[in-house]
Structures are given as structure tokens and as C-alpha cells.
Amino acid sequence: MKRTLLLCSIVFAVQSHAQDQQIGIIDFFGLRNITVTRARVALGLQEGDTLPMSFSSIEQRLKDSLGMAEAHLNVVCCDDSGKLILFVGIQEAAAKHSMYRKSPNWNIFLPTDITDAYNSFFEAFQIAVSKGIVGDDISQGHSLMADSATRFWQERFLVFARHQSKILRTVLRNSADPEQRATAAYVIGYASDKRLVTDDLLLAAVDEDEVVRNNAARALAAIASLAQRKPGLHIKISPTPFINMLSSPVWTDRNKALMVLSILTTKRDRQLLLQLRDKEFRSLVEMARWKSKGHAFNAFLILGRVGGVPDRELKKVGWNLPRRNALIDKIVKANRRK
């Protein structure tokens, strides 16, 4: 079964659009005591190299040669020249406690009309990506793609979420099958009562399975955007799981955490910004310096808010690497004085 929008948008785009599978950018995250230079030597890859067929041996080499607890490689498409972007996630020491919820064990499944629709949506999205049609509208608290064929299936999800919410919520919380949970996480985001499913999605955001977490966080980002615009809906989304994800060695965790937190910090809640400064300042600085501008921007935006820089200034300099790094240096220096 096809599992997720995530795999489609990354893998299919890489296969279709990258120029000869050539690496254009390598960005690291999670480095604390190990230097980038040392990590690059252990990685054995550099910009301009062809993407290897498998990452498992490279991840193992990183762990063995550097004595790290975890190493994860993720590739996404593409930099400004159409080449691949390779993210190298590091966890130097083993985590004392898992941030993830242990997988449930119920033998329960979604109706086939839901899984069939999800698979059809996936296929339509693949075609849309191949044509470069990736825009979507999240103004209603869920994604509606610009591509009509993809949107057709998303509109079916609205019907499923309205009439089969009980089974969707039960599968999301209890199914032993991660593919079932991932499908439920995506479809349940189309519920008309976003407040009702927020807790279900927050639980899924700490699922043991990466794809379930990704789909849940993607849904919560759209809901968070709606909640910001319509406070009368009284939708509350805890930032805690997403703050914790900023330490994850898994790129999709960090990517979606930045997406959600860039929305939750829009109004610059003082307590949230203090939490981010006290717990994840270093992670934000590291990600804000990524050479991949589009992926660095949310980290830079959040870091700037932590540092008290107006959004208009952040958006003005965020796409210029030298100016971005200069402002990051200024924020870091100011933080040391606090």
C-alpha cells in the first residue's frame, strides 16, 4: 500500500526532477561536540557527487566512525539549480527517554473505501508533482490542492471525516498497522470540527512511526493556521511535541515541527518564545544556517521571533544567505548577554 504524501512528494520529485541524481547541497543537524568537517569526512559524500542507491551503509559508517547513537539521511528535491538536497541528521548521545508513543496493538482497520481513496489521492498527487502543480489552499484548516484531480479525492476525505470519524479516530489511536494509522492521520484532518480531532492528532504527532507523525503534524499545521485566524473556534494546539521534535535526528520531524511552530509563534506568545530560547535555541540557530534557503526559513523566522526581530525584517533578509547569517550572529550575541 502506498503510505503517504510525504514519500510521494520527496521520492517522486527526486526521481522526476533532479539532474542526474546529483547532490547540490549537504546540510547537517544535531551536531554538538562533533564538527561539521569531521562529520563530512565520515559521510564520504560532497556536493556534486551522485546520490548513492542506499543510505543504510552510510548511516552505519557515520555511527561507527563518530561513535554516535543515531544517524539519518534524508534527500529532498531540489535546490535552485535542480540538484538534490541531502540532510544529515545526527544524535550524538542516546536519548534518556523516547519522545515517541509506543505503537498500539489492536487488530483494527479502516474501511476499504477510505484506504482506496487515500491510495487514489496519492497517485493523483504523484502526477500533479510531476507537472509541478503543488500549490494548495489551507484556509479552511485542511489542504485543498490546486490540481483538480488531487482535490477531488481530498473532497472525498471531507465526507469520510464527517460520516466515519469514529472509526478514523479509533484506528488512529489503536491500530497496530502503521499504514492504517498514517492514512487515518491524514484523512481525519478533514473533520469539520477541528477542535474535536486536535487531541487525536497531537497523540499521533508523537507516534512511533515517522509517517504517522508527519501526516499528523501536517494536518495540525493547517488547523493551527485556521486557529490563528479564527480564535473564536477555541482550538488549542500544544507546542510541546513540536518543541521536542527540534532535537530529533529525523528530518521530517524537524521539518514539520518548524512548520507548526512558525504558525504557533505568529503572535509571539512570550512563554512559548522563552521555552524555545531555553530549550532549543542551539537547534534553531543550526537549522537557520542551512544553505537550503526554503528549508532554513521557518527556523530563521522562529529564531528571529525569539530574538525580538520584527517579521518584516526577517522576511526581507531571510533569502539572502550572507545577510541571514549576519542577523543570526547578532541574535546569538544578544542571547549570550541574557
Residue ranges and their predicted role:
Residues 19-32, 45-104:
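Periplasmic polypeptide-binding modules associated with outer-membrane biogenesis and secretion
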Residues 36, 40-43, 55-63, 165, ...:
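Extracytoplasmic/secreted envelope proteins and their assembly/folding machinery
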Residues 4-13:
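Sec-dependent N-terminal signal peptides
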Residues 14-18:
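Sec/Tat signal peptide C-region and signal peptidase I cleavage site
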Residues 91, 95-195, 203-206, 210-240, ...:
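Extended repeat-based scaffolds of very large eukaryotic assembly and lipid-transport proteins
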Residues 259-261, 265:
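Short, solvent-exposed interaction modules
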